[in-house]
Amino acid sequence: MREVVSLNVGQAGGQIANSCWELYCLEHGIQPDGYLTEERKAADPDQGFNTFFSETGQGKYVPRTIYCDLEPNVVDEVRTGPYRALFHPEQMITGKEDASNNYARGHYTVGKEMIDQCLDKVRRVADNCSGLQGFLVFHSFGGGQGSGFGALLMERLSVDYGKKTKLEFCVYPAPQNATSVVEPYNSILTTHTTLEHSDVQFMVDNEAIYDICRRNLGIERPSYENSNRLMAQGQSPITAIMLLFDCALNVDLNEFQTNLVPYPRIHFPLASYSPVVSAGKASHESNSVMEVTIVCFEPNNQMVKCDPRNGKYMATCLLYRGDVVPKDVHAVAATLKTKRTVQFVDLQPTGFKIGICYQPPTMVPNGDLAKVNRACMLSNTTAISEAWTALSHKFDLIYSKRAFVHWYVGEGMEEGEF
């Protein structure tokens, strides 16, 4: 079996993971206490569980996941929340003081004390796997723990599990709504550190997600819960097709790397997801395979604020969920190739990697989204440089005044690292 261990670092990692596990449990018919529902037991047992869940002797399913947080708030919500019986209590690791938005605290001072405990738990979970495929790491770039501790964790995973694939789902600092003033420092430092250690980094920014919620779902003031559920839906085709279900065209963890990353350092694919429609509107729209796919190429459906029309595509991967026929998908791919609106770089052939999963997407009860066939597009495009350009410009602005640098130096960094 090909298992995957997911690691959730910091507040953003923990909260996104909560939404993802809620979704995985619904998809597999696993109750919040870890046991299967009656309908699920009666149905054909599906072996896709083992990728993300390990089964105990009593028939309980335990997620292969580890929560690491330097302060206990987010993990305490899990410990007291509806899914408290699902997770193994030892796999939730919390410290007493947070990294206070400081990369150096997460990476050098506070993070150093927790990293061995964290890796010990990772080793235990990994030893339970018969064929560990790799790691999914959820964290943010802007916070102190997501950036500092996340980078430290990636470095140590590379040492201990060199050949295993490491996929990251990162919350990237949004251009307009920032949560802290030192986000550019943290993001640039963590990107520089993890560039060699990460295989693929899927970037998401909150502003793009909020815009999708406002525009397509009619939520005036989206909360983190709305955005995290949308992110979970956006990454569920990736995990479902890759691992969980028996699919027409299956994709493996290593295949993402092979198909999306032409050069090891250019590993920042853009994710886009369609259709994002509320339950009220869904019955009035046709949502054909063609429409759903073309919407994926629109700039306002990307999960990062950048315009793919300004760049060229290096590689594209189309993942479908629901009642989708391969014939339609190939017709769509042929149409896109002739259209020339989708510009590929000259050195790459215009090919689309395609995955189809017949299991329709599962919706959270009373959630925002309607149950329709979905497409998720992962593309490695040169347009992502817009996001980095904006960020490095902010970094230069703050660093030219040496603002806030003393906080980092005081925690054991050297100014030369900037």
Curated annotation (Swiss-Prot):
InterPro entries reported for this sequence: Alpha_tubulin, Tub_FtsZ_C, Tubulin, Tubulin/FtsZ-like_C, Tubulin/FtsZ_2-layer-sand-dom, Tubulin/FtsZ_GTPase_sf, Tubulin_C, Tubulin_FtsZ_GTPase
Subcellular location: Cytoplasm, Cytoskeleton
One of the record's GO cellular component terms: cytoplasm
UniProt-listed Enzyme Commission number(s): 3.6.5.-
Cofactor(s), by name: Mg(2+)
Alphabetical list of SUPFAM superfamilies matching this protein: Tubulin C-terminal domain-like (SSF55307), Tubulin nucleotide-binding domain-like (SSF52490)
First-level EC class: hydrolase
Binding site for Mg(2+): 71
Residue ranges the record marks as coiled coil: none
Reactions catalysed: GTP + H2O = GDP + phosphate + H(+)
Role description: Tubulin is the major constituent of microtubules, a cylinder consisting of laterally associated linear protofilaments composed of alpha- and beta-tubulin heterodimers. Microtubules grow by the addition of GTP-tubulin dimers to the microtubule end, where a stabilizing cap forms. Below the cap, tubulin dimers are in GDP-bound state, owing to GTPase activity of alpha-tubulin.
Name of the molecule in the record: Tubulin alpha chain
